[in-house]
């Protein structure tokens, strides 16, 4: 193993000089010697003259010029397989849950090729989430990719936790959760939530939180993905949750600037599309097994045309858009039924009835949206009888799209509800057909099935 020495440290970027005949390859891992904490660097550029520019996977505090660095001669490798279940690991696959070594049988490099075209497979099976608005408007496909888009504080992480809880309990497969640049508190809450719902032994957790250097946050998504790929290649259907994909992009922006690349639109890295592609192309299903992924996507300043969310859109099968306006009405989950889409919402996949009900719900809500201006200026009395009926049904639908969550029981004080797709379609079909025109709209707020709304109306 060749050794070199540090010649320059600029924040998270470290330049290391090696002998001319032993320059490490790009993406090779290097280990710094003589530091109290283990520090791994990843080669990003070869500058010539035996010098390589690297990003640090940990804090570069206390590094000095002249420290010895060893070339490990392979990319960063992490534990994979069943030994990782129920454990919390960092970007290097080291345990951070104080439960001793992982005891893995195999380690895989985090940089891997995406599967070839011949190996790819797609599926039309639906994954039932038990969340009414998602199952109805933007159904998820098994082996598909779902994005949860939303600005700050509209409920991406809570929706993600509810999805994990529902799917992990209903679907008995394995899941991998990658916490990319999110709050440590959320990671902690998440761990306890998994423990309480008794699904921790089916989940591998990989965390690279907000306080970590950019190199760490840039690679932690790949660490989680590598663990998911191992389960997929063993022939399993695995779930991959990434919270938050925007922080992956942001870490790339930080690293790109430190490496001296010219910024592109809005200050993002010039390699934005390629970096996103490298990650997303690997999140796919093959003939052996499937990876179903749910990714939270932070939308800066609620602007969906920002280059980061816009680049992510292209890779997804279903997009769940969370709206600040709906959250301000107190309707949770704050999913915008007119902005959310899914490739599965096709009569050939979901069936004619589901398709008609979903499109019917959207058209009623769209009509209500158009009438809002008239109501604001002239008042409800100026509407025709038909339009009054549309408004009344739209307001009921809007409230019926809300639902109490299991993971939010502490905040709402009402028990969570899992609603089957069959019940969801039946409920919305009834509202559209006017079967519940006699009930007050408050009865539809924060209930599960339509029967609960009828019961609630009796108490009002």
From Swiss-Prot:
InterPro entries: AAA+_ATPase, ATP-synt_VA_C, ATP_synth_F1_bsu, ATPase_a/bsu_AS, ATPase_alpha/beta_chains, ATPase_F1/V1/A1_a/bsu_N, ATPase_F1/V1/A1_a/bsu_N_sf, ATPase_F1/V1/A1_a/bsu_nucl-bd. One of its GO terms (molecular function) is proton-transporting ATP synthase activity, rotational mechanism. The keyword Cytoplasm does not apply. ATP binds at residues 150-157. It is a peripheral membrane protein. GO terms for cellular component: plasma membrane; proton-transporting ATP synthase complex. It is found in: Cell inner membrane. SUPFAM superfamilies: C-terminal domain of alpha and beta subunits of F1 ATP synthase, N-terminal domain of alpha and beta subunits of F1 ATP synthase, P-loop containing nucleoside triphosphate hydrolases. Gene3D superfamilies: 2.40.10.170, Bovine Mitochondrial F1-atpase, Atp Synthase Beta Chain, Chain D, domain 3, P-loop containing nucleotide triphosphate hydrolases. Its EC number is 7.1.2.2. CDD domains: ATP-synt_F1_beta_C (cd18110), ATP-synt_F1_beta_N (cd18115), F1-ATPase_beta_CD (cd01133). It catalyses: ATP + H2O + 4 H(+)(in) = ADP + phosphate + 5 H(+)(out). Produces ATP from ADP in the presence of a proton gradient across the membrane. The catalytic sites are hosted primarily by the beta subunits. F-type ATPases have 2 components, CF(1) - the catalytic core - and CF(0) - the membrane proton channel. CF(1) has five subunits: alpha(3), beta(3), gamma(1), delta(1), epsilon(1). CF(0) has three main subunits: a(1), b(2) and c(9-12). The alpha and beta chains form an alternating ring which encloses part of the gamma chain. CF(1) is attached to CF(0) by a central stalk formed by the gamma and epsilon chains, while a peripheral stalk is formed by the delta and b chains. This is ATP synthase subunit beta. It comes from Yersinia pestis. The gene is atpD.
């Amino acid at each position: 193993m060749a050794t070199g020495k540090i010649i320059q440290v600029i924040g998270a970027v470290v330049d290391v000089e090696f002998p001319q005949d032993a320059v490490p390859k790009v993406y090779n891992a290097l280990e710094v010697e003589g530091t109290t904490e283990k520090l791994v660097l990843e080669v990003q550029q070869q500058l010539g003259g035996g010098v390589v520019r690297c990003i640090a996977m940990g804090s570069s505090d206390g590094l000095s010029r002249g420290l010895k660095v060893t070339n490990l001669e392979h990319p960063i490798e992490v534990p994979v397989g069943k030994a990782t279940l129920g454990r919390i690991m960092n970007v290097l696959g080291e345990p951070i849950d104080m439960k001793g070594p992982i005891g893995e049988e195999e380690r895989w490099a985090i940089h891997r090729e995406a599967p070839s075209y011949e190996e790819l497979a797609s599926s039309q099976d639906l994954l039932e989430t038990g969340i009414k608005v998602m199952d109805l408007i933007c159904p998820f496909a098994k082996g598909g990719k779902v994005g949860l888009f939303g600005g700050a504080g509209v409920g991406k992480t809570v929706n993600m936790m509810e999805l994990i809880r529902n799917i992990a309990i209903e679907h008995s497969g394995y899941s991998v959760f990658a916490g990319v640049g999110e709050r440590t508190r959320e990671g902690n809450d998440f761990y306890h939530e998994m423990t309480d719902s008794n699904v921790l032994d089916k989940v591998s957790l990989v965390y690279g939180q907000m306080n970590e250097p950019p190199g760490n946050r840039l690679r932690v998504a790949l660490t989680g993905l590598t663990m998911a790929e191992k389960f997929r290649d063993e022939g399993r259907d695995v779930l991959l949750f990434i919270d938050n994909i925007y922080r992956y992009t942001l870490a790339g922006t930080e690293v790109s600037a430190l490496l001296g690349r010219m910024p592109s639109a809005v200050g993002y890295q010039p390699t934005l599309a390629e970096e996103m592609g490298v990650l997303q192309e690997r999140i796919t299903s093959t003939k052996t097994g499937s990876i179903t992924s749910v990714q939270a996507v932070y939308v800066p300043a609620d602007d969906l045309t920002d280059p980061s969310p816009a680049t992510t859109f292209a890779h997804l099968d279903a997009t769940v858009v969370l709206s600040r306006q709906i959250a301000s009405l107190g309707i949770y989950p704050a999913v915008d039924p007119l902005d959310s889409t899914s490739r599965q919402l096709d009569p050939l996949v979901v069936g004619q009835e589901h398709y008609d009900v979903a499109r019917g719900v959207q058209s009623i809500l769209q009509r209500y949206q158009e009438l809002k201006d008239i109501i604001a200026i002239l008042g409800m009395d100026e509407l025709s009888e038909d339009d009054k009926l549309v408004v009344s049904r739209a307001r009921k639908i809007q409230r019926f799209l809300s639902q109490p969550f299991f993971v939010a029981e502490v905040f709402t004080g009402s028990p969570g509800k899992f609603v089957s797709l069959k019940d969801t379609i039946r409920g919305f079909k009834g509202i559209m057909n006017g079967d519940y025109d006699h009930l007050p709209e408050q009865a539809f707020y924060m209930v599960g099935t339509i029967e609960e709304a009828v019961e609630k109306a009796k108490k009002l």
